[in-house]
Swiss-Prot record:
EC number annotated for this UniProt entry: 3.1.1.96
Name this protein carries in UniProt: D-aminoacyl-tRNA deacylase
Pfam family, one: Tyr_Deacylase
Keyword Zinc part of the UniProt annotation: no
Gene for this chain: dtd
EC category: hydrolase
Swiss-Prot/TrEMBL keywords: Cytoplasm, Hydrolase, RNA-binding, tRNA-binding
Function noted in UniProt: An aminoacyl-tRNA editing enzyme that deacylates mischarged D-aminoacyl-tRNAs. Also deacylates mischarged glycyl-tRNA(Ala), protecting cells against glycine mischarging by AlaRS. Acts via tRNA-based rather than protein-based catalysis; rejects L-amino acids rather than detecting D-amino acids in the active site. By recycling D-aminoacyl-tRNA to D-amino acids and free tRNA molecules, this enzyme counteracts the toxicity associated with the formation of D-aminoacyl-tRNA entities in vivo and helps enforce protein L-homochirality.
Lineage per the UniProt record: Bacteria, Pseudomonadati, Pseudomonadota, Betaproteobacteria, Burkholderiales
Amino acid sequence: MIALLQRVTRASVVVNDVTIGAIGAGLMVLLCAERGDTPKEADALLGKLLAYRVFADDAGKMNRSVTDVAGGVLLVPQFTLAADTCSGTRPSFTPAAAPELARSLFDYFVAQAVQRHVQVATGEFGADMQVSLTNDGPVTFWLQVKPAI
């Protein structure tokens, strides 16, 4: 499972001209399930994401997590993160989980995030979304938990 996280001062997602999710300062997270992923990978990735230290402490070092700063988390499904771009000029999405599994894992991830973190907003699986954000830094990290085979 993959999470591309960006530290933001604000972020929102719009579907059909309606804002369906928005946060202030926190993390905007593009989330992708890969073939072979299970709730085990989702749990591991969520734990890492909520504890990942990307916010500055009093000394200016990245030493605080989104949990520590009580920041928002905007979770946006994006299967294109699993693209295989190694050959040719057209990406292959073979590494991505099948849509049914991906939706199930996204929903599971969101449910677990809501249980573990106060401020959670989401995009809509399968929708054409417009995502807006103001990067803070910019600070961007790729987190990935590979399925145990």
